[in-house]
Amino acid sequence: MLNRKSPRMLGFDFASARIYFVTINCNKSQHILGEIVKNEDSNQIVLSEIGMIATEKINELSSHHAGVEVLEYVVMPNHIHMLISLQKLVKTSTLSTIVGSYKSGVSRMARQAFPGLELWQASFSDHVIRDENDLLTHSEYIRMNVDRWQKDKYFIKA
């Protein structure tokens, strides 16, 4: 069995009240959540069935996890960005358990329509929001992500 090194910062309290910028990637960077359609002056994401499930589950996060609020999010063809606000959580709830349950819930629903689908890359990326300026920067990044798709570091021509 392969022992993966955790990307989580050792000794950091991921159950503490903070805001996190989270990125969840699709397995092998597959474009399975939707596609970007170019309009005259902007781009638009057209969600696939799986992308709609992912969006539905994002909107349910706060009802499944007390103290969790998704401030902003964007579903892209091969990844998702979220700004997640955590109030002080119970010891069994951390950012990792919340994201893990989200990924499991989306996968479970998606596999009903697409049996055997390997939807997600292992783990996820996170950034602790440090101040108001950092929050504004990441919030704008999320809002502009669809329009900047061709310049995005996760962009892979489908």
Language-model features: locations:
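Short catalytic/metal-binding and nucleic-acid-binding patches
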Residues: M1-A158
